[in-house]
Amino acid sequence: MSRIGRVERATNETKVFVEVNLDGTGAADISTGVGFYDHMLHQIAKHGLFDLTVRTEGDLHIDAHHTMEDTALALGAAFREALGDRSGIRRFADAKVPLDEALAEVTVDISGRPYLVHSEPEGMAPMIGRDYDTTMTRHIFESFVAQARITLHVHVPYGRIPHHIVECQFKAVARALRSACERDPRVTGVPSTKGTL
């Protein structure tokens, strides 16, 4: 049974299409109009081994906020759809990923309960490239978590270069999601004593 989620989201601010295959090979076809964000979504696909298509048209003449937020919301909804009833998955996972001087530590619970804990070094430069506001990283994960209905802890204890601080977070999230979404042949049904997630 394929685990594919497809979501289309349209507002007066953005038009978003996302398709994700949880059992993919890391193939990615991504275009949001925000170069660094595209680069981060490629990390999710590559290191999560998710086949990911993202097409976003947004009001970039204002700024990139709506584009990144709505893409993350659609991505979370697509993950939720692809997971189905969550039967047979590992559910919990964690990952540590370094990128030179920066380190990200991520723990995920595919719990049905949206919750984000996020911390990164303070005092980062406000922009990466011309259009990625570094304060959006937390908001991107908040938006994703809200729709995916997962619990996500992201901690960057140290790092100096903003590009590295952000990128190692996306890579670690990808690796943790990959492990948490994997099917475990020993798990029968939903991995919860409640019987539902």
From Swiss-Prot:
InterPro entries according to UniProt: IGPD_sf, ImidazoleglycerolP_deHydtase, ImidazoleglycerP_deHydtase_CS, Ribosomal_Su5_D2-typ_SF
Alphabetized GO MF terms: imidazoleglycerol-phosphate dehydratase activity
Known pathway: Amino-acid biosynthesis; L-histidine biosynthesis; L-histidine from 5-phospho-alpha-D-ribose 1-diphosphate: step 6/9
Family: Belongs to the imidazoleglycerol-phosphate dehydratase family.
Disulfide linkage: none
Name of the protein in question: Imidazoleglycerol-phosphate dehydratase
Keywords associated with the record: Amino-acid biosynthesis, Cytoplasm, Histidine biosynthesis, Lyase
Transmembrane stretches, start-end: none
Catalytic activity field: D-erythro-1-(imidazol-4-yl)glycerol 3-phosphate = 3-(imidazol-4-yl)-2-oxopropyl phosphate + H2O
CDD domains assigned to the protein according to its UniProt record, in alphabetical order: IGPD (cd07914)
Database matches in PROSITE patterns: IGP_DEHYDRATASE_1, IGP_DEHYDRATASE_2
Compartmental location: Cytoplasm
Gene: hisB
EC number assigned by the record: 4.2.1.19
Biological source species: Thermobifida fusca (strain YX)
UniProt cross-references to Pfam families, sorted A to Z: IGPD
Gene Ontology CC entries for this record: cytoplasm
An annotated GO BP: L-histidine biosynthetic process
Group of enzyme by EC: lyase
